[in-house]
């Protein structure tokens, strides 16, 4: 299925219309429930709910509370192709248990980014895969110095420099003028483009090795099936408890 993904902001309606003319579906990543109506108003077909745990540009709402709200927001809505608007979950998902949790909350699918940074096939900068494997979930930060918008990246000495109270105030002044702090530092020879942030999600804490994409997919599916089997057992147990309780109540009557 041809798919165009808009990750920063709502795409112009004219762009969406042109894509539709060529049979291309449009997915919009959102970080707040109120963004859904704006996205649907321009004809977006799929909503990707990305929690703040995600790598790159993210909002402030975590994945767990965000997904159910987005699912509720699209309920009963149809896209330009006449099908219900699906919700794709994103943000901090790294294994089958996370996928199962998202499906339980009403998502139709998931969007994994950081999990595949460590794939052998990923086209990433030297050392990027190794950084993901070595880092823990607490080793990321959301910061605006690279694009002017909150962006979750790996913590470095450079990002640490910009998180002191004095530098935060300086950052806000630069952004108010439309100046990107990193570019200002590069211009003043206080940084180089090598200091640019490496986007990655808090999922890094659950990623322990570099492997082929095919193995990652196989692991995800095996974990998902195991999680769903656990759900089935739990549901069966609850149903038995309810049946026994109903029978006991009927006997007392």
PLM features per residue range, with description:
Residues 1-88, 95-114:
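Alpha/beta enzyme core
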Residues 60-88, 94-253:
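Conserved active-site-proximal phosphate/metal-binding subdomains
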